[in-house]
Amino acid sequence: MKILKAGFNRQKRVWKQGQKNWQKVSADCRKVENMAEKKLVALTFDDGPSVGTTDKVLDVLKENDIVASFFLIGQKITEESAYLVKRAHDMGCTIENHSKTHPGMTGLTDEEILEEISYTTNKIEEITGEKPAFFRPPYIDYDQRLFDLVDLGFICGYGCEDWLPEVSAEERTRRILEQAHPGFIILVHDMEGNTQTVEAIKKIIPALKGQGYEFVTIRDLFAKSGKVPERNTLYMEV
């Protein structure tokens, strides 16, 4: 299990794509032996629900008979997109929290942080009947105050810079497969127009299944590994 903990010195690099910022945290990590007996992997998607992308992602999941976890932006859960949330949940996917407006969370007041979380939690519960169990901070921007305020498990993951249009589907596939190991969390995006990630997962999923991996939700990744999410911890793997 690899975990990132608040309190380490971090260097942050920021990329900008149009109006979309991404903040990548380079942090000290400590590695703990992975105790999972099976080769488990959790495929996770950020920045949905997106009509035109999330539905294609769900088609790929159905074709491959697997589940995933979706970290949703609350303000994107609308009358037009709510059916995607219900469809994902009905397929056995878990629906998690990715804030209301996708801000840098550490720059907010306590009240603003709680509104970002509660708004999205309520929108998800209205559709699925279940509250999120996990939170992924936008831009992986977090600190101890966020840990103290947000009573959810914190999730990061292994990505492939799939928010950058110049990173091809083939390169996204290669990067994810090179990082594969038991218990790892894949972090990709189902934002509007991200068709290259849709194409990438068409290759990633069968490749990992061919290596003996079982795709599970983020919740089952913990449960099947016999782990309980700890406070003050940001997980990249379990």
Segments predicted by a language model, with ranges:
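Short, well-structured secondary-structure segments
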Residues: 42-43, 58-78, 87-89, 93-98, ...
